[in-house]
Amino acid sequence: MMEFLSNKPLLITDTILRDAHQSQAATRMTIEDMLPALEVLDSIGYYSLECWGGATFDACMRFLNEDPWERLRTLKKGLPNTKLQMLFRGQNILGYKHYADDVVDAFCRKSIENGINIIRIFDALNDVRNLEQAIKSTKKYGGVVEATLSYTISPIHSEAYFVKLAKELEQMGADAICIKDMANLLLPMEAYSLVKALKETISVPIHLHTHNTSGTGDMTLLMAAYAGVDIVDTALSPMANGTSQPATESLVATLRGTPRDTGLDLSKMSDAAVHFRKVAQRLQDAGILDPKVLRVDTNTLLYQVPGGMLSNLISQLKQAGKEDKYYDVLAEIPRVRKDFGYPPLVTPSSQIVGTQAVMNVIMGERYKAFPKESKAMLRGEYGKLPGEVNEEVRAKAGIAPEDVITCRPADQLEPELKKYKEEFKGIAKSEEDVLSLALFPQVAPKFIANRDNPATQAAPAAAPAPTKADPNAVRELYVEYKF
C-alpha cells in the first residue's frame, strides 16, 4: 500500500467566498449571500478562507453595487478566528496593466489593514521581477506572502523549471509557495512528483490550487497529499467541481483516519452547505450559474487549453458566424503560444494568445494583423516571456530587436499614487477610494458617486456590458475584437 510522505494533518483553504463563485457564477455572490454562513464557516477550522481579490473587486462595483473594501471589512468582522486570503496579480494588482511600485505598495498596505492575512501573488509569465514589489510590501506590512508558480505544460515548463522557480521565490522572501494549476492540467502522478521534488528542495509550506474541469482534480489533490503537500484549495460542495475546485467534504472524508486527517468537522460543513445550496440555486435560477460549468470537459486534457477558454472560443466564433473554424482555431492556439514564447494560458496571456489565434484563422492569413495586446506582449511590456519568441513574427508586428523591453517593466513607470490622489480628490473619500479609482477608472467613479444613495442600494446593479474603452473590465476570455 502507498505510504504518505507526511504525517501532518492536511490544511484546507476553502474558496467558497471567492474562486468557487468566480469560476461557476461569474463572481456574482453578494455579501448578503455570505453573511448567514460566516459564523459556521469560522468554526470549521480552515487554514484560511479565500474571499477577496481576483475578479471580486471589479465585480463588486460593476455588477453588485458593493464597495469591495467594505465587503472585506465585513468579512473580517464575521470571521475573527480564520485567516483571510486574497489573489493578487503581482504588478497588475487586480487589474490588467502594470502599476507603479507605490500603487502596488499602497494596495498591499490597505488590503492588510482592512483584514487580509495571506496574499497569493502570481504573474502570468512567471517573471519574478513582476512579483518583487508585492512580495516586499506584503512582508513590510505583516502579511503572509504566498508566491505562486503559474503551472502549465510546454517544452519550457518542466518539473526542473518549477523547482528552480520555487527556490528563487523562497529566496525572495516567500512564506509559502503555491502551485496554481488554473487550467486543471496537473495530473495526479505529475502532482506527486512535483510536490515531492519541491519538498526536497524548499523548506516553506507548499499550497496546491487546482480545478476539476477535466475531472482529475480530486485525484490530483489526493496524490499531492501522499507526496506531502501542506495545504490544498477546495470548495464547499454546493459550488464545487467542474470549473471550480474539488469538493471540500469529499477530501476531508477521504483522509479521515489517515496520517493526513484534516481534523475538520463534516457536520459543520454540512450546515454551511445547506445555506450555499440556496445561494447556488438562486444564481442558477437567475441564469448566472449555468449547469454546463459542472460538466467534465476532457478537451482540456487533449488540447492543454483551459476549459473556460474553450467555451469562450465557441462564443467568439458564433458571433463571427465561423463555428466551422473551431478545430482550426484549437490547432492554431498552441502554434501562437509557441511563437509567443510559451506563455502560461492565464489572464492576461490567455486572452492575448486566444484572440491572436482567432484572428489568424478568421483572416485566412497568419499574423495579418496584431491587436495592441499582442504587440505589447511581444515587446516585453508584460514581462519576460518564458521561451524564445519567433523573431519573424515579432518583426511582422513591427517590433525591432532594439525595441524589446529587457528591464523590469515597472522600472519604466514613475510613481503614480500622488497623481491619482490629485486626480480623484473631488470624488475619493479615502485612500481606498483612490485605489479603486486608479484600478477601475471606468466603473469606480459612478459607483462611488452613487454609493450613499439609497435608491441605488435597492438591488445589485444590472450593469451594462463592458465597453471597448474599458481596459480593466471583468474579462471572460478574449480581448474584444470585431470580426
Name every feature range the model reports, one short phrase each.
Residues 11-19, 47-51, 82-90, 119-120, ...:
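Hydrophobic faces of well-ordered beta-strands that scaffold small-molecule active sites
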Residues 121, 181, 227-244:
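Glycine-rich phosphate-binding active-site loops on the catalytic face of alpha/beta enzymes
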Residues 1-24, 72, 77:
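N-terminal amphipathic alpha-helix/helix-capping segment at the start of soluble metabolic enzymes
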Residues 45, 115-117, 141-143, 171-175, ...:
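Glycine-enriched alpha-helix->loop->beta-strand junction motifs that scaffold or abut catalytic
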Residues 219, 244, 252-253, 262-322:
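Core active-site phosphate/anionic-ligand binding loop and the adjoining beta-turn-alpha structural block
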Residues 36, 42-60, 290, 294-299, ...:
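Terminal or standalone catalytic/regulatory effector modules within metabolic enzymes
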